[in-house]
Amino acid sequence: MCRKKNIGTHSTYAQNWQTFTQLIMKTAYIVRAYRTAVGKAPRGLFRFKRPDELAAETVAHLMDSIPELDKKRIDDVIVGNAMPEAEQGLNMARLISLMGLETDTVPGVTVNRYCASGLETIAMATAKIQSGMAECIIAGGSESMSYIPFGGYKPVPDYELVKNGKEDYYWGMGLTAEAVAKEYNISREDQDAFSYDSHQKALAALKSDAFKDQIVSIHIEETYLEGNTKKTRNYVVDTDEGPRADTAIDKLAKLRPVFSAGGSVTAGNASQTSDGAAMVLVMSEDMVKELGVTPIARMVSYAAAGVPPRIMGIGPVAAIPKALKQAGMKQEDIELIELNEAFASQSLAVIRTLGLNSDIINVNGGAIALGHPLGCTGAKLSVQLFDEMKKRNNKYGMVTMCVGTGQGAAGIFERL
C-alpha cells in the first residue's frame, strides 16, 4: 500500500490549501448595477406590473448599457425571490432571462433566502465565476408584494413542530420585532426617532437626485374603467414612492402597535411592503479585459448565519463578524453600510450590539422610508451601496440584513 506523505498538521494543511485555492481562483468583477424605483404595495405605482416584467425591463436596460457584450455569452441569470409562487413561480428567473435578453440560450435559476435572496445571488455569481464554472452572470432580485403578499397565499406550517413548542419557527416578522425590542430594551421612542430619521434622509436623497444614476425608468400602461368606458393611461416610474414628507415624531407616536397588544412596533417604525427589481452584471477578469469594460466593484466576502427564529432581527449580529473574518478585515475598515431596516427595533439592536457607526449607515434612508421588496432588497441595497461609495470615494462597504426564520446575511464589497 502506498502511504501518503506527511504534509504537516491539519492547521498547516488548511493554510496551504487556502493559499493554493487563492492562487487558482479567478477574480469576479461587478461591471454594471441598476435597480427600479421601489413602489408601495399593494396599491402603489407598480400594482399592475408583474415582477417578471419589472425585472426583465431592468435586465434589458443593463444590457443596453454594455453593447460590447454578446448576450449569448451570458452563462446564467440568477434571481432572488422570497415568495416564488403564482406570478413569481414557474422559475421566474428563466422567464426574466427569456423576456429581458430575448434569446432562449441563457438559462435562469430562482433563489430563495427570503430577505437576503438578492444578495445571495451576487455571492453565487461571484463564487461560480471565481471557481471557473462561469464567465458572465446576471444576478439580482425581483419581488412584487402587490401580487404576492408576505407568506404567500397558502402557507402550511408543520403543526407537529408547533405542538412541540416550536411555534416561533412560524412567527410573523412583527412578533419577532417585538421580541427583539423587549430583549434588547429598544424603547418605542427610540424606534420612532430612528424611523423619522430614515424618512428625513430619504427625502433629502430624493431632493438631491441621489438615486438618479441607479434607477431604470419603467413605463406603465394602466387600463381602467371610468363609468362604462374603458380607458388607458401611461406613465413612467423613476422615483421611489415610499418616503413621506409629512412624517413627524408626534404622528409616529400616535400610531398603535399592530403586532402585539401593548407592544412598540407600529406601521410607522416597520419597513414598507414594496415592489421592485435590481440587477447586477458579474464578469470574470478575463472577460473584463477582453471587452475593455471598467469594473465598479467586487464582492470580497459573503456570510450567512443562523440565530434563534424568535429574534430573527439580530441576524446581522452573527453574520457581520463572519463576513469580516472571511475578508480578514475589522469593523473599522468598513466605510459605508446598507443595513436593511426591516424594523427599527432590530436595526437599533444590531447597531448597538455591534457598536456600529450610525453616521455611515443608510446615509440615504432605509427600508422604513424607501421600502423592502423582500427578495429584491439585497441586490437593491448593493446597487445603492456601489453608487454612494463612488460619490464618497469609499473603498469598502457592506450590505447586511436579517432574514426570516432566524438568519442573517452580510456581504462586503470593494469599490474599484
Locations of the language-model features?
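N-terminal extracellular/periplasmic Venus flytrap/periplasmic-binding protein-like
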Residues: 35-37, 48, 52-57, 68, ...
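Short, well-ordered amphipathic alpha-helical segments that serve as non-catalytic structural scaffolds
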Residues: 51-67, 92-96, 121, 173-180, ...
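Active-site-proximal alpha-helical scaffold in enzymes
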Residues: 113-142, 181-210, 279-286, 351, ...
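Active-site pocket-lining segment
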Residues: 214, 218, 300-369
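Condensing-enzyme catalytic core mediating Claisen C-C bond formation in acyl metabolism
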Residues: 24-51, 248-314, 325, 383-384, ...
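Conserved catalytic cysteine-centered active-site region
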Residues: 49, 81-135, 168-175, 246-272, ...
